Amino acid sequence: MKQKKNLSGRIFNISRKLYLKKMLLPAKLLESINRILFSCEIPPSADIHPNAIFGHNALGIVINEQTFVGENTVIMHQVTIGGNMGKYRLKDKQKIYAPTIGKNVMIGTGAKILGPIIIGDYAQIGAGAVVHKDVPNKGVAVGIPATTIKVLSDKEAIEAYSKI
């Protein structure tokens, strides 16, 4: 992984740690600072791995508070990760309205990932794609609505991710 954590990512990580320690006011204050500086909405309740990368300082990124994002995932600018008109899935008897995104995923600029779907490890989401169905591990999803056009081999997936 060539990229390093940028300022918006650092602010989010501190906000998340404060949130987990039940220090809600400072956590929300940092969320607001990110919103003002980078026009992004990344709530501290979102379970985003500390090693996830926000491209271009998270400019215009909007993420649902129930979202899970795995390690080393790259989320480019203008991405929306959110709910889909009240649709949900059950996980441990709890309603989940937002996407679950695996590790080492690449989400291209302007992509929209909507609803209680699962994006598998090493998946690639094309720029501008509107994803409302699950994407398998190592799947490549593009288009509006997005379709999985290919499932990469292990070698292809690792090679593609290493170029980010």
Residue ranges and their predicted role:
Residues 85-86, 117, 152-153:
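Conserved catalytic-core motifs of eukaryotic protein kinase domains, centered on the activation segment
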Residues 38, 43-44, 49-50, 55-56, ...:
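Left-handed beta-helix
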Residues 92, 123, 141, 158-159:
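Glycine-rich, phosphate-binding/catalytic loops in enzymes
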Residues 89-97:
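Regulatory activation segment
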